[in-house]
């Protein structure tokens, strides 16, 4: 079980209300209906499905911060003390039809973020995309916002200093916990590999762990029920009833 987030004095006491308002302003551009049975969100104006993704980057380091050794004799070093690190970017779908996606990158510049947006659009070519994203400087660059508008990607910025509202943070937490150093030591012939082979192997482990973790949709239930469903139902309550909508020309 993950430990709770510490209170950040920089975070506004109204961060939850701010997040709901941000989503409300994005959703009001469309005529969305949430299907309780399938979990899908549909825009009734265009008859397209709406997908909600949680997007963030994370750095992975494959050594522990410290190693405790208790021995009455001279201890034998069995751990690779070299540093191997890489940076991953992930799109975690909060809707059943969305295709989760993870990739690795060298930096987090605005050009890199633009390429990531193009990748997620290729993975989901026809749907409307709402992206939960933090306030990192590259995420708020004008060229990134302009590209998102061209690709029909709605950027839903989180309130500052509120990682608990970002579902993919729990995915990264579990991913790092599952790939601790003691498991890496068990990889066959790991010590005999060169640096590039080790990094490729570790990236493979991260990718497999990511797709395995995102199959469990319980991580985002709280965000979905508390923040995403209410604005949709508040904007268009009649579309969430049993009454069928008839359009008269």
Each model region followed by its residue ranges:
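Acidic, metal-coordinating catalytic cores used for nucleic-acid/nucleotide bond scission
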Residues: 61, 131-144, 160-165
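RNase H-like polynucleotidyl transferase catalytic core
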Residues: 76-82, 149-167, 184-185
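Short, conserved catalytic/metal-binding motifs centered on acidic residues
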Residues: 53-59, 92, 133-135, 166-169
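C-terminal anion-handling pockets and recognition modules
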Residues: 47-50, 168-249
């Amino acid at each position: 079980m993950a430990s709770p987030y510490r209170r950040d004095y920089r975070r506004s006491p109204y961060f939850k209300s701010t997040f709901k308002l941000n989503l409300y302003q994005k959703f009001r551009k469309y005529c969305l209906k949430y299907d309780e049975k399938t979990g899908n969100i549909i825009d009734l104006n265009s008859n397209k499905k709406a997908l909600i993704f949680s997007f963030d980057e994370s750095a992975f380091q494959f050594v522990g911060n410290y190693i405790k050794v208790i021995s009455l004799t001279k201890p034998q070093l069995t751990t690779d003390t070299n540093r191997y690190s890489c940076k991953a970017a992930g799109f975690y779908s909060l809707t059943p039809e969305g295709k989760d996606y993870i990739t690795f990158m060298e930096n987090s510049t605005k050009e890199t973020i633009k390429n990531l947006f193009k990748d997620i659009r290729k993975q989901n070519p026809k749907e409307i995309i709402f992206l939960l994203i933090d306030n990192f400087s590259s995420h708020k660059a004008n060229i990134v916002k302009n590209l998102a508008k061209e690709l029909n990607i709605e950027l839903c910025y989180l309130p500052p200093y509120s990682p608990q509202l970002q579902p993919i943070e729990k995915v990264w937490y579990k991913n790092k916990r599952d790939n601790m150093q003691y498991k890496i030591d068990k990889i066959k012939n790991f010590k005999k590999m060169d640096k590039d082979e080790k990094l490729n192997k570790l990236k493979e482990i991260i990718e497999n762990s990511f797709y395995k973790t995102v199959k469990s949709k319980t991580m985002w239930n709280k965000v979905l029920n508390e923040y995403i469903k209410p604005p949709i139902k508040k904007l268009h309550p009649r579309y969430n009833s049993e009454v069928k909508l008839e359009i008269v020309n």
